[in-house]
């Protein structure tokens, strides 16, 4: 069967994360269920990585092997009708038979949104309602603590052996609504890594955490060493880039 790379957006609020789990409503589970409904046979999809409960995606990717029965435009239309309103398939692109959506990743880009003004109930599931001002200059200066290749074990709840990751760039921006956007570019991220980094940056900003403490978490890495974690609602998988 031909292999395709899919690009998909989703609202993470109603789901128990990306990865299918028995008894839970997940993004992967819903897409596979609807593909099986369309083709009348089980079909597995393989994502570029997992997102946790409540985390959103603008351009998540997965690969899938599909029977050559439906035109792609018709398939996308059927999927989007079945997945409405929380999942939207943007594209299906033919790829090589051995292409793998996870192992071929070169760079992942995540965004994190923080509301620094008054509480906004309309954004409760989409933006961290921090509701206090942030010093952008300090925020930008503190991002340097996380740049480069480091052992991020302290900033994760991951059990995996390889906890070395490279963060090539972190961009700090604020728009006219007071929403601060942190954009992270890396070769991959551990579970909860970005949420722990964001919470650490905010704690550094309000002086409840010292730079020396953050450096110690890198010098003496230990699972879950970082004790702060930003809410899932503000995190978005923005882009997955391949070789």
Swiss-Prot record:
Q: Which EC number(s) are documented for this chain?
A: 5.4.99.12
Q: Please name the catalytic residues of this protein.
A: 52
tRNA processing as a keyword of this entry, yes or no, is yes
Leader sequence range is none
Reaction catalysis annotation: uridine(38/39/40) in tRNA = pseudouridine(38/39/40) in tRNA
Where substrate binds, per the record, is at 110
Sorted UniProt keywords: Isomerase, tRNA processing
- Please tell me whether the keyword Ion transport is annotated for this protein: no
Family matches, as InterPro entries: PsdUridine_synth_cat_dom_sf (IPR020103), PsdUridine_synth_TruA (IPR001406), PsdUridine_synth_TruA_a/b_dom (IPR020097), PsdUridine_synth_TruA_C (IPR020095), TruA/RsuA/RluB/E/F_N (IPR020094)
| GO molecular-function terms, A-Z | RNA binding; tRNA pseudouridine(38-40) synthase activity
Name the Pfam families on file: PseudoU_synth_1
Biological process terms from the Gene Ontology for this record are: tRNA pseudouridine synthesis
- How does this polypeptide assemble, per the annotation? Homodimer.
Q: Which family does it belong to?
A: Belongs to the tRNA pseudouridine synthase TruA family.
Q: What does this protein do?
A: Formation of pseudouridine at positions 38, 39 and 40 in the anticodon stem and loop of transfer RNAs.
Q: What is this protein called?
A: tRNA pseudouridine synthase A
Record organism: Mycoplasma pneumoniae (strain ATCC 29342 / M129 / Subtype 1) (Mycoplasmoides pneumoniae)
The gene designation is: truA
């Amino acid at each position: 069967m031909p292999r395709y790379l899919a690009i998909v957006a989703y609202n993470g609020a109603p789901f128990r994360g990306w990865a299918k789990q028995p008894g839970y409503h997940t993004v992967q589970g819903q897409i596979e269920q609807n593909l099986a409904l369309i083709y009348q046979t089980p079909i597995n999809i393989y994502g570029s990585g997992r997102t946790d409960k409540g985390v959103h995606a603008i351009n998540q990717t997965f690969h899938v092997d599909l029977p050559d029965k439906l035109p792609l435009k018709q398939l996308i239309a059927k999927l989007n009708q079945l997945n409405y309103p929380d999942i939207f398939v943007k594209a299906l692109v033919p790829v090589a038979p051995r292409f793998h959506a996870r192992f071929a990743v070169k760079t992942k880009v995540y965004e994190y949104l923080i509301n620094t003004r008054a509480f906004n109930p309309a954004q409760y599931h989409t933006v961290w309602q921090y509701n206090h001002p942030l010093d952008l200059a300090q925020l930008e200066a503190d991002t340097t603590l996380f740049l480069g290749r480091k052992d991020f074990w302290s900033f994760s709840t991951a059990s995996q052996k390889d906890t070395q990751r490279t963060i090539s760039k972190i961009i700090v921006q604020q728009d006219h609504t007071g929403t601060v956007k942190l954009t992270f570019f890396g070769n991959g991220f551990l579970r909860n890594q970005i949420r722990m980094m964001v919470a650490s940056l905010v704690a550094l900003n309000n002086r409840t955490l010292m730079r020396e403490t953050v450096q110690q978490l890198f010098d003496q890495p230990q699972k879950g060493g970082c004790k702060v974690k930003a809410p899932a609602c503000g995190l978005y998988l923005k882009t997955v880039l391949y070789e």
